[in-house]
């Protein structure tokens, strides 16, 4: 019947000399997806297919539309509790997770090193089992990826990586949602990384090719990404027909790039290396000189907090900078992660183009 109505309206419009006026009807019913993530851990995007990552971004866009745009209240996590373990301090990760989980009707519990010492006062195995009996999921922001792996192995609930020495997957989800909103699609974009070969770069390397994105990365000598991760990223690039290049020249990495990306030069726990790192990263500041060799539609991303030596004010506060929409999207993407791992909810919004 809906199909017949579409045909009648289109024919009527054509008879009056107009082009087709009815293209699609969206009834607002949940869209059934083949992707099922409930009960999974999110430790690294290496463990997820392109379709699965797309699903989390689709769900992010759906929640953002329904809650922010339409003003709906969606208690999808009512009765659920989240354990938040933070060995490292945070603004965006903590705020986005606490407010997002609560907005969906759930109860987040924040634990610092004053409350819990992973593997110190209690073994990781025991901690994982206790958390499994009292919460529905755990988000952990830790120094060592190996601690996350142990928690995931011993727990019977989903474990989410809020940041580790190797990966920061939830940040990359926010980055990709921001880019999809700005460009309309991710496929074919060239990402230009200029900075440390750190957890952010590692997470991009584990996912960009799955969306058909190219990656050009510049890091100082001695600060390159993990060789094992590079090897796997090369495999992903080959499988997906994308380009991956590594260099020590920032301008070479920026050349033709759609998205200029950098991050802190000195991560938490590296404070003793500050003088050495500042010297090694000379010439890596993102400026308008960097942008001049980028694509004409270039934009800029930084996961924050930002220091002026990493990117100057002219770029950081320019209309091309997407850093603050990127920060806001941390909330919508972590909400989507929790909903996908803890519920059977399906998006209502039509799937965006990726």
Curated annotation (Swiss-Prot):
Pathway: Nitrogen metabolism; urea cycle; L-citrulline from L-ornithine and carbamoyl phosphate: step 1/1. L-ornithine binds at residues 141, 199, 263-267, 302-305, 330. Keywords: Acetylation, Amino-acid biosynthesis, Arginine biosynthesis, Disease variant, Mitochondrion, Phosphoprotein, Transferase, Transit peptide, Urea cycle. Residues 1-32 form a transit peptide. The modification Phosphoserine is found at residue 133. It catalyses: carbamoyl phosphate + L-ornithine = L-citrulline + phosphate + H(+). One of its GO terms (cellular component) is mitochondrial inner membrane. The keyword Phosphoprotein applies. Acetylation at Lys-88 negatively regulates ornithine carbamoyltransferase activity in response to nutrient signals. This is Ornithine transcarbamylase, mitochondrial. It comes from Mus musculus (Mouse). The lineage of its organism: Eukaryota, Metazoa, Chordata, Craniata, Vertebrata.
């Amino acid at each position: 019947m809906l199909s017949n109505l579409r045909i009648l309206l289109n024919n009527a419009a054509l008879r009056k000399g107009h082009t087709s006026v009815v293209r699609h009807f969206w009834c607002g019913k949940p869209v059934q997806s083949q992707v099922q993530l409930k009960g999974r851990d999110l430790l690294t995007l290496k463990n997820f297919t392109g379709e699965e990552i797309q699903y989390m971004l689709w769900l992010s866009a759906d929640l953002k539309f329904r809650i922010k745009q339409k003003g709906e209240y969606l208690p999808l996590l009512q009765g659920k509790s989240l354990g938040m373990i933070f060995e490292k301090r945070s603004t965006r990760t903590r705020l986005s997770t606490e407010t997002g989980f609560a907005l969906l009707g759930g109860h987040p519990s924040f634990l610092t090193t004053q409350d819990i010492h992973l593997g110190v006062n209690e073994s990781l195995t025991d901690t994982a089992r206790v958390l499994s009996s009292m919460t529905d999921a755990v988000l952990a922001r830790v120094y060592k990826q190996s601690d996350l792996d142990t928690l995931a192995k011993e727990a019977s609930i989903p474990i989410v990586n809020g940041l580790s020495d190797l990966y920061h997957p939830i940040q990359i989800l926010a980055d990709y949602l921001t880019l999809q909103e700005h460009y309309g699609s991710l496929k074919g974009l060239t990402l230009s990384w200029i900075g440390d070969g750190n957890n952010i770069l590692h997470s991009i390397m584990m996912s960009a090719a799955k969306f058909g994105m190219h990656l050009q990365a510049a890091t100082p000598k001695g600060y390159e990404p993990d060789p094992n991760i590079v090897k796997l990223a090369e495999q992903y690039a080959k499988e997906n027909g994308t380009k991956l290049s590594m260099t020590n020249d920032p301008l070479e990495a920026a050349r033709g790039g759609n998205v200029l990306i950098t991050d802190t030069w000195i991560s938490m726990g590296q404070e003793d290396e500050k003088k050495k790192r500042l010297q090694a990263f000379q010439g890596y500041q993102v400026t308008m000189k960097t942008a001049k060799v980028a694509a004409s539609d270039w934009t800029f991303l930084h996961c924050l907090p930002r220091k002026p030596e990493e990117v100057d004010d002219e770029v950081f506060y320019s209309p091309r900078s997407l850093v603050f929409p990127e920060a806001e999207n941390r909330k919508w993407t972590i909400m989507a992660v929790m909903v996908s791992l803890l519920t059977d909810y399906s998006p209502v919004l039509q799937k965006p183009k990726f």
